[in-house]
């Protein structure tokens, strides 16, 4: 509506209103009128008179990513969007469509939700993704069919990860990747809260912190936990402050895993 605002203008028939003025009194009047009629309203650059925000959008339909600062800094939202645009391939929308087409078939074949999540994670890390990006959908169909035919219950594995001195920016890329895919995280006293925030949100987290003459879980108990969860087919992240082997007992844990036939990886940390 390109006209001066008047209180006689009824907004009740609109679902959404944007007040694009630089007059706070007008914004206030539009806001109050919308509030009275239960209409969503956004006043540009005037957060107190907003009932919704307009985020910066990365559109890879059906995949959509939105970035917002709750009106605090739209410029920052756009800057972050620009950074993310470069890291999200344009073919991601095709991959989402492809996944949706196969979702029911995969669910019928792999009924356990944790195993199904692992299947999709492994599939997205395989050559299938590039086939979909390049519109080679027949080849992609063959790859997922083959993956379903050859699917076996995943075997457990342990990741001995050094969390470094506590600064999340000092984590290695591999450490971060394994932390975010682990089903169980067993961590000690020296692992900082910001580091723990980077672990997978729904992972089971078990504290086994040690202080002098006060071990919440003795080393034998920690070894047993690692073997137990890995034997259940879970991916276990043993997260240690610093490096797993410097002032740590990673060597003992490896011996126990080796004796039990459990696969493991070691990721050094900055000390």
What kind of feature is each model-predicted range?
Residues 1-25, 155-160, 180-270:
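Class I S-adenosyl-L-methionine
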Residues 28, 77-78, 172-173, 219-220, ...:
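Conserved strand-to-helix beginnings and helix N-cap segments that scaffold or border functional pockets
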Residues 37-52, 90-96, 256-271:
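Short, acidic/small-residue loops that bind anionic groups at enzyme active sites
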Residues 53-57, 149-150, 174-175, 227:
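A generic local secondary-structure boundary/capping motif
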Residues 71-152:
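An accessory alpha-helical subdomain
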Residues 153-154, 160-168:
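Flexible loop/N-cap segments at domain edges
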Residues 166-168, 173-178:
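Cofactor-pocket helix-loop regions in the catalytic cores of large enzyme subunits
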């Amino acid at each position: 509506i390109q006209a001066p605002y008047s209180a006689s203008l009824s907004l009740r028939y609109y679902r959404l209103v944007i007040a694009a003025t630089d007059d706070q009194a007008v914004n206030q009047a539009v806001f109050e009128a919308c509030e009275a009629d239960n209409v969503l309203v956004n006043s540009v650059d005037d957060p107190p008179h907003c009932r919704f925000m307009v985020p910066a959008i990365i559109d890879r339909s059906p995949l959509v990513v939105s970035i917002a600062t709750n009106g605090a800094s739209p410029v920052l939202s756009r800057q972050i969007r620009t950074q993310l645009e470069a890291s999200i391939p344009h073919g991601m929308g095709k991959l989402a469509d492809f996944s949706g087409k196969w979702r029911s078939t995969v669910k019928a074949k792999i009924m356990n939700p944790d195993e199904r999540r692992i299947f999709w994670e492994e599939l997205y890390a395989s050559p299938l993704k590039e086939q979909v990006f390049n519109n080679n959908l027949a080849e992609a169909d063959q790859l997922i069919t083959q993956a379903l035919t050859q699917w076996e219950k995943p075997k457990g594995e342990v990741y001995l990860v050094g969390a470094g001195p506590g600064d999340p920016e000092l984590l290695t890329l591999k450490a971060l990747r394994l932390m975010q895919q682990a089903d169980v995280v067993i961590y000690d006293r020296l692992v900082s809260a910001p580091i723990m925030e980077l672990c997978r949100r729904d992972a089971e987290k078990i504290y086994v912190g040690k202080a002098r003459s006060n071990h919440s879980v003795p080393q034998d108990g920690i070894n047993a936990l690692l073997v137990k969860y890995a034997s259940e087919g879970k991916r276990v992240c043993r997260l240690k402050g610093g490096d797993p082997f410097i002032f740590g007992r990673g060597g003992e844990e490896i011996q126990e895993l080796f004796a039990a036939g459990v696969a493991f990886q070691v990721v050094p940390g900055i000390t």
